[in-house]
């Protein structure tokens, strides 16, 4: 299926909206309008980008936007990976990654995403990259576009469930293995697996440990690869990373709104201070509902509160 992307001005978008009928209600986050026209799907995003999808995408784009040239050109050899790493972007891949594992506050989110080799160009055009290089605003903008057309599964382990599992002896590695495997299985049920070439997991454990902790077998073990710094090697992992980070950021925004104060990410001294403030205002039980209890930040925050009242 062809995918073509244009970046339009607001006046150009308004002109496009007047040419044919678009649906503007009950849309995915980040989407301004959507329609089906001549066996093609047209998505208009709040970012100003317009995506044409379908076998007639190019012809429809030329009809509706005759003065524009597509921005989704073939990239050069940037698809190639060095060393022994496979050039995953030449293949149809499921990638998986997580967010929140190093953050005291907030949940653990895991996403698996399927990127066909035909969609590699479109992801590059949109600016998909390692989520660690992107700020929250860009993460939200990209994720709200990706979730409209990339088959994916997003799982969130909230803090109460995370803490319950940790209390009965689950390590974070075990939690991640179980969630990654579940998300990957969910995606395999959404695609034609005869066309799937590889499953690429951003490595947090060696294969043997992952298989032992995953609670169920790998869907396609012969196709499964583990890669360190996977976001830079596979756009499927990069897409999964962005969507999982998006879910984490939105959840953190929800916590901040609920607590009526900014809740920082990470596990720094600033986090200790905010945690101490929450204990002081609301009690340790409230803190435990929005944080990972086994992090050392909890003890440090309690010590700060104790010192305050000495």
Swiss-Prot record:
InterPro entries: RNase_HII/HIII, RNase_HII/HIII_dom, RNase_HIII, RNase_HIII_N, RNaseH-like_sf, RNaseH_sf, TBP_dom_sf
Keywords of the record: Cytoplasm, Endonuclease, Hydrolase, Magnesium, Metal-binding, Nuclease
Compartment(s): Cytoplasm
RNase H type-2 domain: residues covered: 91-307
Pfam families: DUF3378, RNase_HII
Catalytic activity field: Endonucleolytic cleavage to 5'-phosphomonoester
Highest taxon of source: Bacteria
Predominant subcellular localization, coarse grouping: cytoplasm
EC number(s) stated in the UniProt entry for this protein: 3.1.26.4
Necessary cofactors: Mn(2+); Mg(2+)
Family to which this protein belongs: Belongs to the RNase HII family. RnhC subfamily.
Job description of the protein: Endonuclease that specifically degrades the RNA of RNA-DNA hybrids.
Name this polypeptide is given: Ribonuclease HIII
Organism field: Staphylococcus haemolyticus (strain JCSC1435)
Gene: rnhC
